[in-house]
Amino acid sequence: MIGRERMTVASQRLIAERTYELTLSGRLVQEMRQPGQFVHVKVAASADPLLRRPLSLCHIDHKQGQCTIIYRQEGKGTALLAQKQPGDTVDVLGPLGNGFPLEAAPADSRALLVGGGIGVPPLYELAKQLTKRGVKVVSVLGFQTKAAVFYEEEFAAFGETHVATDDGSHGTAGRVTDVIEARSLEFDVLYACGPKPMLRALAERFPNRPVYLSLEERMGCGVGACFACVCHVPGSETAYKKVCSDGPVFRAGEVVL
């Protein structure tokens, strides 16, 4: 159920270049279940900036009543969010969207998780939940450079993990698709989140496989009312789907990337 709450900042720390890990406490956590969903955060009490920021859920801890989100400081909104200290509160709406289908990976199957940059965070909760279901998880994480790398050890706790950097400063030099090819990584189902070129490359590389992609789009309302995040459906000039409410996770081929 979607709710709204002024959640309390439990902790915040810089974990990579311009990348922050923010942990929030509140009753709204009990509504958070599906990996790949997101929350819409109002970063300031004033009307500037006006729009909420869509931030994916990285970790859900029902026992502690806490959720963790990871974001990159890009503009005024996230700069304000980066200033939040423990004890401060933020206005949170969520959980929103349709996340990754866990049922696509039955017990004893092999799931390949592929993340690019700030698309990595939602895959962490996915890795955790898949592992609990008896799924073998292999992760491939892509970043621009070593300074941008985060959560490598955290993913390694769930299984085989590979890192690629564009400049070769850490892990494999190149892209996530280079790692998949070089390592001949096999899978029964693939889950991915990251920039569109990466998602497009994965969809084209595995056209007849179960591939689920989480799209990153700018959003206005987060609930499907404003039509700011629509994407087209293949074979139609008029049909579309909304990333915020129909997604953000789609099966490859379901929408035009």
UniProtKB/Swiss-Prot annotation:
Annotated positions binding [2Fe-2S] cluster: 221, 226, 229, 244
FAD-binding FR-type domain residues: 2-102
DNA-binding recorded as keyword: no
Cofactor(s) needed for function: [2Fe-2S] cluster; FAD
InterPro entries recorded: Cbr1-like_FAD-bd_dom, Cyt_c3_hydrogenase_gsu, Dihydroorotate_DH_ele_sf, Dihydroorotate_DH_Fe-S-bd, Dihydroorotate_DHASE_ETsu, FAD-bd_FR_type, FNR_nucleotide-bd, OxRdtase_FAD/NAD-bd
GO molecular function: 2 iron, 2 sulfur cluster binding; electron transfer activity; flavin adenine dinucleotide binding; metal ion binding; oxidoreductase activity
SUPFAM superfamilies given in the database record: Ferredoxin reductase-like, C-terminal NADP-linked domain, Riboflavin synthase domain-like
Cofactor, how bound (note): Binds 1 [2Fe-2S] cluster per subunit.
Keywords: 2Fe-2S, Electron transport, FAD, Flavoprotein, Iron, Iron-sulfur, Metal-binding, Pyrimidine biosynthesis, Transport
Associated pathway: Pyrimidine metabolism; UMP biosynthesis via de novo pathway; orotate from (S)-dihydroorotate (NAD(+) route): step 1/1
Entry-linked Pfam families: DHODB_Fe-S_bind, FAD_binding_6, NAD_binding_1
Superkingdom of source: Bacteria
Role, per record: Responsible for channeling the electrons from the oxidation of dihydroorotate from the FMN redox center in the PyrD type B subunit to the ultimate electron acceptor NAD(+).
Oligomer and partners: Heterotetramer of 2 PyrK and 2 PyrD type B subunits.
Full protein name: Dihydroorotate dehydrogenase B (NAD(+)), electron transfer subunit
Originating organism: Geobacillus kaustophilus (strain HTA426)
Highest classification ranks of the organism: Bacteria, Bacillati, Bacillota, Bacilli, Bacillales
Gene for this chain: pyrK
